[in-house]
């Protein structure tokens, strides 16, 4: 079972209560089917959580958990694909899974990070970039979307927001936005038509400039709203 929290594209963060319920469901299904079920927890946005909260770890609630992490988000190094898979020590066959994980990158050679970047990351394991800029950007963008009449859930983390498009065809909606220098991702790419994803992992100044473009887009293309 693969989970992604904090979630791309919605920005949702699963609560401890949700993860406990998931863990109980997995325990029940393991007994029902008579074999182990593993959770692969995709956690590249772990530090990007808003309102002073911290994201819970599913491995605290479920033994058979593999946690996948990437430094590309916490250190603002999106071009450097470097991270790790943490095997819960209480996981079934943990002694076999650890060496298996270490062999994966060797088998897919182009995913191997350079020695230089590995040494660099080792020196900053407990450091992060300034994560507060994402919350500032999110609040600016969310408030403007609500002001313009979009239906949108306020993100709890990541640097994405996932509003409902102003027409059923999200692809057409995003294509219209291009005329206003707004690059949006239609939700069809995520198997959920009718929405679009916006990213705000940029300078706050650029987010502010985009708000005017967003308003022009909506008022010009959808004047009856």
Predicted region positions:
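PLP-dependent class I/II
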Residues: 1-225
């Amino acid at each position: 079972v693969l989970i992604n929290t904090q979630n791309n594209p919605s920005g949702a963060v699963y609560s401890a209560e949700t993860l406990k319920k998931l863990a109980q469901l997995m325990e029940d299904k393991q007994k029902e089917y008579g074999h182990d079920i593993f959770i692969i927890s995709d956690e590249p946005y772990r530090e990007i959580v808003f309102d002073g909260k911290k994201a819970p770890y599913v491995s605290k609630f479920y033994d058979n958990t593999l946690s996948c992490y990437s430094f590309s988000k916490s250190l603002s190094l999106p071009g450097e694909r470097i991270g790790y898979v943490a095997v819960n020590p209480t996981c079934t066959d943990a002694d076999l899974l650890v060496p298996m994980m270490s062999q994966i990158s060797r088998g897919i050679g182009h995913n191997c990070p350079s020695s230089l970047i590995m040494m660099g990351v080792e020196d900053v394991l407990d450091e992060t970039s300034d994560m507060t800029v994402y919350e500032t950007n999110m609040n600016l963008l969310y408030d403007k979307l609500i002001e313009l009449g979009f239906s949108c859930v306020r993100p709890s983390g990541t640097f994405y927001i996932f509003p409902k498009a102003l027409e059923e065809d999200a692809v057409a909606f995003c294509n219209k936005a291009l005329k206003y220098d707004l690059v949006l991702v239609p939700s069809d790419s995520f198997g959920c038509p009718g929405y679009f994803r916006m990213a705000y992992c940029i300078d706050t100044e650029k987010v502010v400039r985009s708000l005017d473009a967003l308003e022009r887009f909506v008022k010009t293309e959808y004047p009856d709203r």
